[in-house]
Amino acid sequence: MLFRSLVEAIVGLPTDMFYNTGIATYVWILSNKKSAERKGYVQLIDAGGFWQKMRKSLGSKRKEMSEAHIATVTRLFGDFTEAELVTVFDAAGQALSEPQLIAGTDTAPTAPEGGKLKRVPISRIFRNQDFGYTTITVERPLRDEAGQVVVGLKGKQKGKPQPDSALRDTENVPLAEDIQAYFEREVLPHAPDAWVDEEKSKVGYEIPFNRHFYVFEPPRNLHAIDEELKAVSANIMKMLEELTE
């Protein structure tokens, strides 16, 4: 479907949306009549945080999307634009408002002095080939007991090194990258005698949905953690002293 550019968008839904299953669910929007701007592209929309609790759960079904949530997803898809949720924090790390949806040409809020903005992507647009790869088979020569390369004796294999199945390996090369350039950069430095069996090459696609919406959270400052531990330890010691009095 990606190869034929039939996928317009993929929407990641919240978990616990269906009876007796808590697994992540995705809605694939397909079309064989894409608009010109969508041809060759796929839109990913992460609606995993768009939910509200049900008044009464049904098995594993505990969440539902409100009309407002559905309207937001519909807008993002219709606008075919990248978007993010932006939260403003003050210098003490307290959120000053609810996350604000910033899409397209919307103006993002500014952080106060000493504060910061937390940006979480909600809608992203990729080229079809960004998800594609070619699986190449990397062969290495079979060697005899003397360490000499074994070559074929008949037909098309005559005089050619024979592959050692025990040393056979595969590599996934992004579609946008030249296979030979990748091979020379990533394989030959480690295996100078290797070659690619082009007859075994296959094209595939993979969409690591969550990876494209991952936001790195830097670890807390070690000094701050150390100070908190000291404060907790001091409080515990004080409580113990009060118990022994």
Q: Could you describe each region identified by the protein language model?
A:
Residues 1-241:
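A conserved structural/catalytic subdomain of Rossmann-like adenosyl-cofactor enzymes
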